[in-house]
């Protein structure tokens, strides 16, 4: 992760599909490596990155301090963070917030359009319309795609046209069954655990999944689905 196989200074633009750190997390490294161009993302993605990239930088710096304390005692080499808070702050200044379905001219002959991917607040599929020799062709990069009928998030939308599609395939090797009733399922687990006097631990991604869990907890509480435990949650 420390060495990039290309020169960031040679990049003209960055197009970001969404804020999850496995997609956005190396942007400060690009800036630290010399990238000075604009970073295009939806408005919601930009706002989330204002939180997540600074948090990621803080974690990088904290880990470096911890490792260097150990290295100093053992005579090991100095550990340098992947990037710093200052790098993240510089990167955030290069973001350009964009709206869904409004084409943006990047340069002569190239425009970009963001379409709601239904994966996370602000997530998008990206369409690049490239005109050369009087012929326009459209390349669509799907980004991470969400399912339909999820709470809190819009359904994914299809780009209007495409000559070429580059698509993610996280669940491409399986068929999903009928969507479970998450409220009923979670209520049963909570009820059984509380009745035994136990505690419930639910590991969850901080951005996206945790908000859905809070939404389910709210439904369970408002509908008073947990019996005999008045202090839930």
What do these predicted regions represent?
Residues 232-233:
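Extended, well-ordered alpha-helical scaffold/bundle regions in very large, multi-domain proteins
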């Amino acid at each position: 992760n420390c060495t990039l196989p290309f020169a960031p200074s040679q990049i003209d633009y960055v197009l970001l599909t969404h804020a999850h750190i496995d997609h956005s997390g190396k942007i400060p490294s690009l800036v630290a490596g010399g990238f000075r161009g604009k970073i295009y993302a939806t408005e919601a993605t930009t706002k989330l990155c204002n939180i997540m990239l600074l948090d990621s930088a803080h974690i990088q710096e904290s880990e470096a301090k911890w490792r260097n304390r150990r290295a100093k005692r053992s005579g090991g080499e100095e550990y340098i963070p992947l990037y710093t808070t200052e790098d993240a702050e510089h990167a955030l200044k290069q973001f350009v917030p964009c709206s869904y379905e409004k084409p943006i001219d990047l340069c002569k002959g190239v425009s970009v359009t963001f379409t709601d991917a239904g994966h996370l607040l602000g997530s998008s599929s990206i369409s690049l319309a490239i005109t050369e020799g009087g012929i326009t062709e459209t390349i669509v990069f799907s980004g991470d795609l969400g399912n339909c009928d999820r709470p809190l998030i819009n359904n994914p939308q299809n780009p209007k046209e495409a000559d070429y599609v580059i698509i993610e395939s996280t669940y491409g090797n399986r068929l999903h069954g009928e969507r479970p009733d998450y409220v009923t399922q979670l209520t049963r687990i909570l009820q059984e655990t509380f009745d035994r006097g136990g505690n419930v631990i639910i590991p969850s991604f901080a951005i996206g999944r945790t908000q859905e869990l809070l939404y389910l907890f709210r439904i369970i509480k408002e509908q008073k689905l947990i019996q005999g435990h008045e202090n839930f949650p």
